[in-house]
Amino acid sequence: MEPVGRKRSRKAAKAQLEAQVTAAQGATKEGSGIASNFPGQPTMEPVGRKRSRKAAKAQLEAQVRAAPAKKHTGKDPVRDECEERNPFTETREEDVTDEHGEREPFAEKDEHTGIHTMKLEHIAADIKKGLAAKREMIKIDKAAYRKTKNTIERALKKKQLKRQKRDYRHTRKLLNVLKEYIAEKQKDDEAEEAEAAAAAAEAAAAAEAAAAAAEVIVVEDEEEEEKEEEEEKEEEEEEGEEEGGGEEGEEGGGGGEGEETEEEEEEEEEEEEEEQIKAFQEKQKRWQQPTGVRSWRLREMKPLLEQLLKAAKDTKDNYCIISSSEESELDN
């Protein structure tokens, strides 16, 4: 399908040629002196002239048909056809005339194609302006996004730094409190241990004194018993000498009763010593119980203290790293 402009140009050229032919025919009619044989009818032209006019008309039509072929010689027919069919490459600068050879008035839009006749340069300029505006908007959006992102990151870093500082202060305070508590606890334990040792020494001394006193008492009792036995023996000997053999039997029975009383006294003394030893052992156990509990508590507190010291050291290292990074950012 050919473009509309070319069709019109061909029609205009054809109409112009027909007008020239009719003008030539009129000139021949006026110049011929042959009258018409019928009234009211034009004069007949000679046969030779008719043939010459037909030949001239055919020649002109052949020239008109050959004109587009000459125009497109040396071009790619497929590409040329695409260019002819492309409505965006057409312009209104072609010579557009109607069938009577008059130029049609210029219109904003082509009635047949419906394509805006604005120049491609203006369209390209508008497209470039729109793209430039879009690029500027994208740049502005990117700058605003970076700014907000940096502000948010700074706020988060400040918040994290404050939190770490607060944790570091609390850990330091807790460490000081724990150290003071452990020191006081150790002092109390040492004082209690000293008191317990002094009490144990006193109890041991008292037990030794009691044992020594008991031994002295036992020795004195034994000495007294020996004296009494000697006196009794002397008395018995004297009585035996006086009274004779019957009384000797009675003296033997009295000696057996004295031995039984001595055995009972020894058993009572042993029981008293055992009771004193048991009481002393119970007192030692009572004194040793609080010291054992305190030592157990101290053993439990030591690993907790070590863990706390380790955590404080880690927080201190983190605080130093963050403060150094913040200083470097401020320098940059």
Swiss-Prot record:
Biased composition (Basic and acidic residues) is annotated at 74-91, 98-114, 276-285
Q: Which GO terms describe its cellular component?
A: nucleolus; synaptonemal complex
Tell me if Nucleus is a UniProt keyword of this record. yes
Superkingdom in the source lineage: Eukaryota
Q: Which family does it belong to?
A: Belongs to the XLR/SYCP3 family.
Q: What is this protein called?
A: Protein FAM9A
Q: Does the keyword Nucleus apply?
A: yes
Task: Return the InterPro entries for the record.
Answer: XLR/SYCP3
Region listing for Disordered, in residue ranges: 1-114, 186-293
Where is it mostly found?
Answer: nucleus
Q: Which PANTHER family does the annotation name?
A: PROTEIN FAM9A, XLR/SCP3/FAM9
Segments of skewed composition (Low complexity): 196-217
| Tissues where this protein is expressed | Expressed exclusively in testis.
List all Acidic residues biased stretches.
Answer: 218-275
What keywords does the record list, in alphabetical order? Nucleus
For bias type Basic residues, the affected ranges are: 1-13
The record's subcellular locations are: Nucleus, Nucleolus
- What is one process in the GO biological process aspect for this record? meiotic cell cycle
